[in-house]
Amino acid sequence: MFVNLFLINIILINAYKFQFEHLITDYIKSFYNNKSDEPIEIANYDRINSDDPNYIYIPIFGTSDIHGHFYPDKFKLEQLNYSQGGLDYMTKYINIIREEFDNKMLYLDGGDLFQGGLESTITNGSIIVDYFNYAKLKGLTLGNHEFDYDKQYMDEKADQANFPFIVSNLYDKANKSRKIYGDKQVITEIYSFKYNVNNEEVEIKIGVIGLTMILTKNQITGGGFDNIEFKDYKSIVEAEAKELKNSKKVNAVVLLSHIGFWCGYSGTGQDVNFTLNMYKKDDKQEPCAQDSNITKLLNDIEDGLLDAVVTGHSHCEVHHWIKDIPIISTVNNGAYANILYLAFDKKNKLKLVPSANRIEGPLPICEKVFNGTHRCDFIENSKLAPFLPIVNYKFHGVIIEKDESMNKIHEKYDELYNEYQETICKIIGTNEELKRYDNGSFYLGNIITDIYNKYTGSQISIISYKGIRSNWSPGDLPKYKIYDILPFGNNLCTFLMRGEHVKKAFKILQSGPRRFYVASGVKQLVIRTDDGDYLSSVKLFDGYEEKDLEDEEEYLISANSFLINGGDEFQKILRFYKPKNLRCDYGKEADVVFKFLKEQKTIDVRKYMDDKNPVIRFINKTNKRVIHTKLYK
C-alpha cells in the first residue's frame, strides 16, 4: 500500500512539474514572440566613453584560436535553425570600435590561425590571412598549431600578411637569431597613438611582447624546424618589458601569448563565463587556475612590468584579473571575442590607471542571437532554449550584420567552399550538442572510434579526444563538419598487438598528460588519486559482455597515422612495441567517417550517450577538486 501511494505521489509531482514547465515555456514564448522585429541591444550596461573627461581609453580587441574558421557554423534542428561564428560579423564589431575611437585601437590575435576549418585547409590558409589583412590586424603571436605546417608554408603566409608575427621566445640555433621568419617577425612591437589634451598634442605608446608555448617543441609535425628552440618565459618577459619601459618609454606593456589560461570552470567542467558585461577588477567572478603558465608567470615576474595580457590556447572565455593585470582570452573557432580597455590619466602625465581598466565581453559572433540569452549557441539541456526566438541584434547601437569589407573575400572563396555544404546524414536521438569534451564525456570520440572499428574490422579503436577539433549538433550534418572535426589529414591505420602490450599501452595512455584517450571495443577502470590517474584494468567489451585480454593473443587495433608514428603518448609505447602488419591504406580519417555516415543516412546517438553502461568507470580516491570523467559506449 505504502509503495503504491509513493508511486502515485511521484506521478502527481511529475505531472504538476510538467504542467508548470509548459506554463512557463508558454509564457516565455508569448513574451518574446510579442516583441517587435526591431534588433535588440545586447550591450545593456555602462559603456566606455571615448571622450571620457578623466581618461584616454585605448581599446584592444582580442581574438585567438580561430583555427581556420572564416564561415559560420550552421545548425539545423527540426524546429530550430541557428549559426555561430563567421568572421564577417567579427569585422563588424571591430569596425564599430574603430569608428567610436577614431581608429585609435589595437586588434591583436593570440595564435592558432589555420588548423581546423575546412576553408583554411582547401585554401592553404590564405582565406584566414586575407581576413586578418582586411580587418587590419596589428599583430599576432604563433600558436602551437602553426608548427603543424612546414616552415615553407608559414613563410608564404608571412609574406601574404600585412601584419607582423610578434614572438620573442624562439631561437634559431643555425642562424643564432630569435627571428625565424625574417623581417615579418618582430621580438616586440610598439604602437603609438596621438591625442589632443587641453589643446596640447600628446602621445601614448603601447609595447607588445609575444610568447609562444614552450611545450610546442614536443608537438611539431611540420618540417624545417629542426634548429628551433623554445626559450623560457620569465627571463625574456622581464628583459623585454624593462627595455620597453625604461629605454623606449612606453606607457604600457601588453603580453600577447599562446601559453594557456583558464578561469571559472564549474564543477561540471563547463565554462561559465559567457555573460556579456563591462567587467572591472573588483567584480565577483569565478576563480582562475593557479597552476596555469600565465598565473605562474605573472606571480613570478617583477611587479609593474606587465600591464595587460591577451592570450590563447585553452579555448576558454576569460575576462579576469591576476593582481592588477587584466587578461582576456576566448573560445575557439571565432565564436566570441573580448575588448580590453586600458585607461591613461589625462591629469597625471598619461599614467596607466589599473583600477580604471575595463574588459567588455564576451562578444557573441554570429548572424543572430537567442533572445533572452544574448548568445549565438544553442544552450543544450535547456527546455526553454528552443522557444527563445533568434533575433537580429545591435552592439553599441549599431546592427551587427555582414561587413561589406569582406565581400572581396567571399568573391574569392565562396564557390570553392559551397561544394562542401551538402547534408550527408541526420543525427537523431538527442537535442544536445555532441562535444569533443563535455563534463568528462566524449560523445564524439565514442561515435568516431566505433566507426573506425566497423570500417576496418578492428576489435579496438583508439583516438585522442584532442585530435577531435569541433563539435556536432543534432539534426542535419553537413559535409564540411566532418573535415572541421578531423582536420589534420591523418590516415586511418590498423595493426596487430598482443594482449600484454594492449594492457601496457592503455596504462600509458590513460595516465599521461593527454589522457583520456577514447577507445571503442574495451571497458576500463581508472583510479583517480592525489598523485595522478592510473588504469586499474582494461577488458574487451562488445557492448554486452566483458572478456579478459589474453597476453599472447593478437588483437587488431585501429588508430590514426599520427599516433602510430609516435605522436603524443604513443612515443612511449613504441619503445617496447613495433607495429606488426601495419596497414594505413584505408584513407584519411575524415574521408572514412564521411563515407561511412553518407551510407548510413541517419545515426542514432543514444547508445553512445547511455550513462548506464560506461566504458570507462572512475573511482575517485583524491581529496582534490576534480572533474569526474565518464565515457559511454
Predicted regions and their residues:
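Cleavable N-terminal signal peptides of Sec/SRP-targeted secreted and luminal proteins
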Residues: M1-A15
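Short acidic, glycine/serine/threonine-rich loops at helix termini
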Residues: D73-F75, G117-I122, K151-M154, K176-G182, ...
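Solvent-exposed loop/turn segments at secondary-structure junctions
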Residues: I66-F70, L113-G116, I127, G139, ...
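Catalytic centers of hydrolytic enzymes
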Residues: F18, L23-E99, Y134, Y191, ...
